[in-house]
Amino acid sequence: MKKKFVPILAAGALIVVIICFMLLGSIIEKYTPSKEHMNLSDYYNLSGEQDVALILDNQILDAKGKLLNGTVYLDYETVCSYLNDRFYWDHNENKLLYTTATDLISADADSTSYYVTKDSHSLDHPIVKADAQTAYIAIDFLKLYSDFSYEVLDSPNRVILTTAWGDYTTAPAKQKTQLRQKGGIKSPILADIGKNMEVTVLETGDTWTKVSTAEGIIGYIKSKALGATSTKTLTSDYVAEEFTHIKKDFKINMAWHQITNADANTTIASVLQNTKGINVISPTWFYLNDNNGNIASLASSDYVNYCHQKGIEVWALVSNLENKDVDTTSVLTYTSKRENLINNLISAAIQYNFDGINVDFEALSSEVGDSYIQFIRELSLKCANNGIVLSVDDYVPSSFTAFYNRAEQATFADYVVVMAYDEHYAGSEEAGSVASIGFVKEGVANTLKEVPADQLILGMPFYARVWSETPVDDTTGADSTTQTSDNNNNDTDETDNAAADAQAADEAAGTSDSADSYQLFTLDSYATSMSEIQKLISTNAAEPVWSDIDGQYYVQYENNGITYKIWVEDAASLEEKLKVLQENQLAGGSFWKLGLELPSIWDTIIKYIN
């Protein structure tokens, strides 16, 4: 029997030994670090010989550069997103532009030459290359006008970009170790780290620490392999240019003067007769008249001379709204057309001797935002060279108008005007104030996030809207809808485009405030003057009620079964808005438009803008 058990015991022992060896092998496998080195081209996701990895401030970008004939190029979108959004690519005329405080830099695609205004300069390679999708800009040219540093490395091709200046943390390796793609010994090795090799510490952990090397490789090192940390400082040698502005040594008290024909210029004396304290007037003289940047003009030397005799500056307004056949986008997106428009405006300023230009371009699409800002930049240079004040009119800030880039406007223009009115407009689905105090305060506060107070002018209304709610016969059982029209024979509104665009966007997003229930009336409105509002109140024996929420009087009355609602603009409501101007120490105020105000309103205005 014993002899029979010997083979069984031997076999069992062998099995145990095998199992032990298997377990030991498994344990060794589990705790043995991987020696696999990852291909860095795969790590950077490079797919071609021309591809260049971009490492920006210790982050690997999805975007790639291009290595063309030994020069690194970055695509236009990457440049604007990460390095410098002041570059402008004209895809229609294949021209790269950059605007400084004093010069317009330009380079044509595939050219080694570039111009600083009229002075020619050159590099030993093309400055910009273009294809059907975008433009690629030489990195050394970008560096001339941008606050970043770069280092070009090969094997594989990559560029280390730095834009974040200040303190950063480093640590030396206490021993030879490995930099791995992820935190774990089984993660592939990205680089071998020598003893005392210094790395930048990005994120510390108990077991693994995220670091970057001087070669732009980002990964993880065992925390215990690192020595004591130290703080170092990155500094930039870039000298930021200074932008100067024409700033008046008085508070701006400006009023827009709507001029619809040449004969209207002769009314200037009567229009100014009952005003007080006006020091700037903005006549609506110019508008885009074709797709080549030519303008229609209603300018008058006699008008300017009269205003100058009264100590009033003339800032002529240029608009894009009057000629509906003009494609503003076509004008703004061609450098040659912008140049023609600007030259026409400057020539008119010199010819008629007016003091400033007030740009009022409205109803733009977001796609033209960059081109519009480039227009403001280019116009500002010509204005500055000729001592002409440049001001720009803007809607109150919203997500739908962010592309107007008020911060960049303020960098180049002398003044920015926030048109704090048209809160409710001809297309509104509900009756409401033209400019409630909350709307004004919010508009000013949000604009001040981008525009310095000493450059911001508050635009205020001299008009109000009369809303009428006419009952609808609902006996048919048909769905009743709210309809709004603008029976505006007084032509008092500047525009309702921004508000209408915002409403359309709301509806597209499903966030419109319109009610789902049937509204048993049609809604109409028209804008009219302060004096006309007072007549309506008196004629209908209406009782104004002060609204603290709106910062103005509210009136409601009925006539022939129709309900009328008015949020009154008068001295009381205007004073609330002027307090906002004063409290925020703004550059001044402006009013739309002359002729709609009560003469007594000026006594209130000069209390705050003297």
Feature names for model-found ranges:
Residues 2-205, 234-248:
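Primary recognition of N-terminal secretory signal peptides and signal-anchoring hydrophobic helices
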Residues 98, 196, 209-213, 221:
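SH3/SH3-like beta-barrel fold
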Residues 176, 222-269:
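Boundary/entry segment of secreted carbohydrate-active catalytic domains
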Residues 235-240, 262-270, 298-303, 340-347, ...:
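Alpha-helical scaffolding within the catalytic cores
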Residues 236, 464-577, 609:
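Glycan-binding loop/region signatures in secreted carbohydrate-active enzymes
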Residues 249-257, 275, 287-437:
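Chitinase-like catalytic core of GlcNAc-active glycosidases
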Residues 265-289, 345-357, 580-588:
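Catalytic domains of carbohydrate-active enzymes, especially glycoside hydrolases
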